Amino acid sequence: MPDNPTGTLPEIILASASPRRRQILSEMGFIFSVCPSQAELYPDGSVAPAEFAVLNAQIKARDIASKYSNGLIIAADTIVVDDFGILGKPSSKKVALNYLSRLGGKPHTVISSVCLLNTENGQIRSATCQSTLTMRPYTQAEAQRYVDSGLPMDKAGAYGIQDKEFNPVENIQGCYLNVVGLPACTLVRLINEMGFNPKLARNWKPEGDCTLCRIYRTEISRLR
C-alpha cells in the first residue's frame, strides 16, 4: 500500500454525468465534484469485453486529469455483453428496441470497470466487477413502451435494473450496484489500495443483496 500516513482523501472528482453514479457516491457519504469526460471508445471487437471496459474507464479518467493538480478522479464504464457482443448505450430508439429484443428472456453479463487516478502523483488503479443477469420474457409491446418513455436511452444495454415499472430483470447473480453502474465494494477497495481510508456514511446500506456480499461485510463494514 502506498505511504500515506493520514489517509486523508484529496478532492474527489467524478468523471461521469450519470445520475446513478452520483447518487451512489452521495449516499455512501462522499463529497465530490462532477466533471464529465467526453472521451469514449466504441467497441470494434478488437479486445475482450472486460479489457474494453477497463480501457474506457482509464481514458475517461485521463481525459480530465490535467484540470486538477491534486485530486482523486473516479471514472467508470459499464457494458452489457450477450452472446453476440457488447451492448453500450443505444444510439437511437430503434437500436434500444433491438437491444431489448436480444436480451429478453435470456442471460447476459454486466461488466463495470472502475478507474481511480491520483492527479498529484499519477498513480492509477483499475478493477472490474461482473454480474450475470437473466431478463424476464417481456413482450415486444412492453419493450416498445419502455423505449418510448426515454428511460433506456442513457443506459448500457438499453435498460436500468432500477426501473421498477418495466422491471426487466428476473434474476441476478452478483453485485447489484455493479449493474446500476458503480460497484461500491470495488470502489472502496481501489481507494484503500491507493492508501486512503474513506469514512462512509453510517446509515448507508447498499441496494439489492449487496449486504450479503463477503467484501461488503469485511471491507465496507470495517470502514464505517
UniProtKB/Swiss-Prot annotation:
Keywords: Cytoplasm, Hydrolase, Nucleotide metabolism
Cofactor(s) this protein requires: a divalent metal cation
Superkingdom of origin organism: Bacteria
One GO process term, biological-process aspect: nucleotide metabolic process
Subcellular location: Cytoplasm
Active site per database record: 77
GO MF annotations in UniProt: dTTP diphosphatase activity; UTP diphosphatase activity
Catalytic activity: dTTP + H2O = dTMP + diphosphate + H(+); UTP + H2O = UMP + diphosphate + H(+)
Enzyme class: hydrolase
EC number(s) stated in the UniProt entry for this protein: 3.6.1.9
SUPFAM superfamilies in the cross-refs: ITPase-like
Site label Important for substrate specificity, positions: 20, 78, 162
GO CC terms in record: cytoplasm
Function: Nucleoside triphosphate pyrophosphatase that hydrolyzes dTTP and UTP. May have a dual role in cell division arrest and in preventing the incorporation of modified nucleotides into cellular nucleic acids.
Family to which the UniProt record says this protein belongs: Belongs to the Maf family. YhdE subfamily.
Protein name as annotated: dTTP/UTP pyrophosphatase
Source species of the chain: Dehalococcoides mccartyi (strain ATCC BAA-2100 / JCM 16839 / KCTC 5957 / BAV1)
UniProt lineage: Bacteria, Bacillati, Chloroflexota, Dehalococcoidia, Dehalococcoidales
